[in-house]
Amino acid sequence: MSLIAELKRRNVIRSAGLYLVGAWLVVQVAGTILPMFGAVDWIARSIVIALAIGFIPAMVVAWVFELTPAGLKRDEDVKTEDSIASQTAHRMNQWLLVVSIVAIGYFAFDKFVLAPRRDAALVMQTTAHVAAQIGAEKPNVSPKSIAVLAFTDLSPGHDQEYFSDGMSEEILNALAKVKDLKVAGRTSSFYYKGRNEDLRVVGKALGVANVLEGSVRTQNSKVRITAQLIRTDDDFHLWSDSYDGDLNDVFALQERIARAITDQLQAVLQGDQKTLLVPVATSSPEAYKLYLQATAIFNRRDGVHFHDAIAGLKQAIELDPKFARAHSRLAALYDVVPQYSADTDLRAALEAVQQYARSAIALDPTLAEAYSALGLSYRVQHRYIEEHAAYEHALALDPNDVTTNFWYGLSELMDGYTRHGMQLLDRTLTIDPMLPNALRWRAKMELSAGDLAGAQRNAQRARDLGLQVVDMNLAEIAHARGDNTNAIERWAAGMRGYLQGMPEGSETIIAEGLYGDDAARTRAIALIDAYVAQARDQINWVAPYVMVQLGEPAKALATMRTSRTNNDADFFALLWTPQGRAMRTSPVFNAFSRAVGLTQLWDKIGPPDLCKKSDAGDYTCE
């Protein structure tokens, strides 16, 4: 008799199958139950080790002994006519079938019910933790808080809005550096431009006790700035004044206004602020005008005119090579240009960021913007350790800088440090509560945590503020609520302008693939595959992001491992959501994270929130 036949006769193979399936089921149930009782990790490991060690003795017993009506007997002592091995085999087949059904049922229950709930609970726990911290830290409205509203352009031709906006922003920036003041961010303050809103509403929305209003009138080289400080709760005018000068002394005018505000609010000044609040940025009035014009384009993310802004800043630098802020703003501008144009030479843009950021730092090492610009460029190059250091340096220079807090917060969300990322994101919204993109990301995190109401509220606020890309998130929310018709319409309408380089009509095909039937999904996958196959230097960020949503996580990881995109944020942040679980638990995830540079960052500053480092150096993620 052959060995295989003898193993079958003695029911060893059936015993092995029954043992393995039963052991797997025990391990899975233990993994679910033990954490509920706060059991330490070694208990679960001990169960696995004991079951593994027990396999060999169990097989030896199955080989040596046979189950009879009289109990276990050595196989050689059982006569052929007394053997009930065939009956035992039949019963074992039944047991194996039952245990297998239970195991398969548990596997399905874990994958489709427990796992999403665990992921959502983890994200919700993080969200609640950070929200509690933010809520605990949030004080009552301080009497030393202020919003600087956009000054009105009263120039004869009403064509100097960039200048009036620039004046108010410069004063805002000067006040924001005073640690004893709470200053609302630019985006939120400028939201009320031209709205003639009740100041009590403004104060409540921005969390400030005072607002600074004003107007700017320029004619030829002459400038008149009128400003007034108003208390928001009763509309009481605390102070007002007018200042006359010319374009050669705009910094002196800004200094006088900022100084008057700090005096009125009795702000405590530190260090050099006691003598100077507004440093002279440039000796060239023309260079400063060009800087303000470019800044206006940069602030409204007017991608159509980015090249005009770049040309203007380069001209400003030619007029005054020592104009550090022009160098810094040019670096930041080159950072965002690729996100608005698929035709941008990414390598050249990154080189420009490095060049102008470093020249800005050489001229003025205190410019947080320059370090933030370096950080964002390092992100694109997957130089995450340097990125992290650049953002930390920028925050040390200016803890209230909105751009630094927001960019750094996104970076942390992308790298898996969800808790810290949300702290920075909420810090951003504390300073600038109407920053549309920050609201969009807050909505994304709330959606991941299962908070549909919060996600809807913040996503809609971002959309009302003019952020079109948030339609993608509103579509995801509609889908979560079972409204796929609305989801398709939202996604197609909102993403039409973000699919640069993709075939015309892609927005409809992808939207239907995401929220339609299987046939539509197949068409969308084919479209994405064809696009990625023909793409050259970089691909549109939407492609790998929707690959995951279309049920192709492995393909998305492979694409992101070998291709550059014009914006990695949504994809990398997706890794740490319930939807990204298939990617971060994939056998190829460690190879992916090493290839893109994440592993090096984790080795340097610690594992991400959902992962643990093994003795072998790999990361196991939940």
Regions picked out by a protein language model, each given a short descriptive name:
Residues 40-43, 343-344, 574:
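Short, surface-exposed loop/turn segments at secondary-structure junctions
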Residues 1-119:
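An N-terminal, helix-rich hydrophobic module
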Residues 15-16, 184, 273-274, 370, ...:
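Short, hydrophobic secondary-structure boundary micro-motifs
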Residues 36, 88-91, 95-96, 100-466, ...:
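Acidic, proline/glycine-rich low-complexity intrinsically disordered segments
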Residues 357, 405, 417-622:
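Alpha-helical protein-protein interaction modules
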Residues 53-56, 63-70, 178, 232, ...:
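Phosphate/oxyanion-binding loops and surfaces in catalytic or ligand/nucleic-acid-binding neighborhoods
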Residues 10, 178, 320, 364, ...:
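Acidic-histidine catalytic/liganding microenvironments
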